[in-house]
């Protein structure tokens, strides 16, 4: 599937797929992910569903995708808490631009997904709006300080939720990140109790293994779950 670049706001977004698509897949991406994007989209395309996929770049990963400020937990960079600005850009610029440019149905099914902190952003965004049909959260950073308490007070509104984690991810020496296993179990149980259509899949390996294929699997599950 060939990519094209579309300028939205001041950002060069990488677009794959076709006009009139049933699904619109959105993923916030860092520079470190762009080289594997072709492979990820090829894996998503193993689904029979018609989709348009947009990779939307973020300048500062830790700032743009974090819902509130938090101190550094790994290396030295903390979190700037600018997710609300990122979500506003998605809802006010990206989605309307793509709908118009690619003649998408008014009620196109929008799936927000991503890996790591982008997965957490997708989950957080679904507590703020009911715009999204589904969330594809691969190895999401649910260890993020205050997230689990926040979600309990302001629950996710999205009907289809895919969660995954590498089976070695919780065995880190970083005490904050080591909570990821317990947190994702708790979140999955909460969602199931509320009647959300959700799954939790365990992948082999640590956090940095097969990020592109894990994310592709997440998007595919959400598209195929209702069929």
Model-derived segments and spans:
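N-terminal cap/lid segment of alpha/beta-hydrolase-fold proteins
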Residues: 1-18
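Short beta-strand immediately N-terminal to the catalytic nucleophile in serine-hydrolase-like folds
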Residues: 109-114, 138
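Gly/Ala-rich beta-loop-alpha elbow adjacent to hydrolase catalytic centers
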Residues: 113-118, 122
């Amino acid at each position: 599937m060939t990519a094209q670049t579309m300028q939205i706001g001041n950002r060069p977004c990488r677009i794959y797929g076709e006009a009139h698509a049933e699904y619109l897949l959105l993923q916030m991406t860092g520079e470190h992910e762009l080289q594997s994007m072709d492979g990820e989209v090829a894996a998503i395309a193993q689904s029979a569903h018609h989709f348009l996929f947009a990779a939307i770049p973020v300048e500062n990963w830790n700032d743009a995708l974090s819902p509130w400020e938090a101190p550094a937990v790994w290396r030295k960079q903390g979190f700037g808490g600018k997710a609300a600005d990122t979500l506003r850009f998605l809802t006010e610029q990206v989605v309307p631009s793509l709908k118009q440019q690619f003649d998408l149905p008014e009620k196109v099914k929008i799936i927000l997904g991503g890996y790591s902190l982008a997965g957490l952003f997708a989950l957080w965004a679904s507590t703020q709006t009911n715009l999204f049909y589904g969330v594809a959260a691969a190895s999401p950073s649910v260890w993020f300080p205050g997230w689990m308490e926040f979600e309990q007070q302001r629950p996710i509104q999205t009907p289809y939720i895919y969660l995954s984690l590498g089976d070695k991810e919780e065995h880190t020496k970083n005490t904050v990140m080591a909570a990821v296993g317990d947190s994702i179990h708790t979140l999955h149980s909460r969602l199931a109790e509320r009647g959300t259509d959700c799954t939790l899949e365990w992948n082999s390996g640590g956090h940095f293994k097969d990020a592109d294929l894990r994310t592709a699997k997440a998007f595919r599950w959400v598209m195929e779950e209702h069929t």
